[in-house]
Amino acid sequence: MDLLQSLAVFFVLLLPGTEVTGTLKSTLDPSLKIYKKMFEVKRREQLLALKNLAQLNDIHQQYKILDVMLKGLFKVLEDSRTVLIAADVLPDGPLPQDEKLKDAFSHVVENTAFFGDVVLRFPKIVHHYFDHNSNWNLLIRWGISFCNQTGVFDQGPHSPVLSLMAQELGITEKDSDFQNPFTIDRTEFIPSTDPFQKALREEEKRRKKEEKRKEIRKGPRISRSQSEL
């Protein structure tokens, strides 16, 4: 799978894959049960995409894909947060009925969970971006809080992802026995090795140089009329 194909897959995953219907949220709410089943389908798609990304043997390509994907994910999360807050949608309240609100709800739930998957599987790359981005920090804190109140993650196989993500990112204090489950088998995901660290630094230097060149090209220029004076 080349870079463009990989990016296309991840952007599709950022879109809502479940339709929210129903009224009151409770453990007996049939609409919530239906949503959770559809959420499971979306989660399988997300996890498969990350598994394929983890199996790439090109660290630079992984870096590029995650760079674009993370920026897109947080843009979607920020826009969806704005929509839900403007409409006074409460995470523990009735499930949205309006189509726009349904999409925003799904965006928040699915992308917050997806980011948790990325954090746990690619912690070094995510920390490289996340630790210096206060806006992302605020957004994911809100996203985790929202998701914890929806009931979507209750009593399911994906319930641990929110807690593990929060601990990995330092949002909550780590349990004494905390262990990122994906750092045990480092052969399947990005290894913690000197070559990786070196490649990560080289890629970051290259991207910073490219950004500086773009800034220089966009800098102020003397207009033709001024130069003729």
Swiss-Prot record:
Regions annotated as coiled coil: 196-218
Signal peptide position in this chain?
Answer: 1-22
Which GO-annotated molecular functions does the record name? protein-macromolecule adaptor activity
* UniProt KW Signal keyword: yes
| Domain of life according to the entry | Eukaryota
Record's comment on post-translational modification: O-glycosylated, with additional sialic acid modifications.
> Does Nucleus appear among the keywords?
yes
- Tell me a GO biological process for this protein: positive regulation of MyD88-dependent toll-like receptor signaling pathway
Which family does the record assign?
Belongs to the CCDC134 family.
What protein name applies here? Coiled-coil domain-containing protein 134
- Recorded source organism is Rattus norvegicus
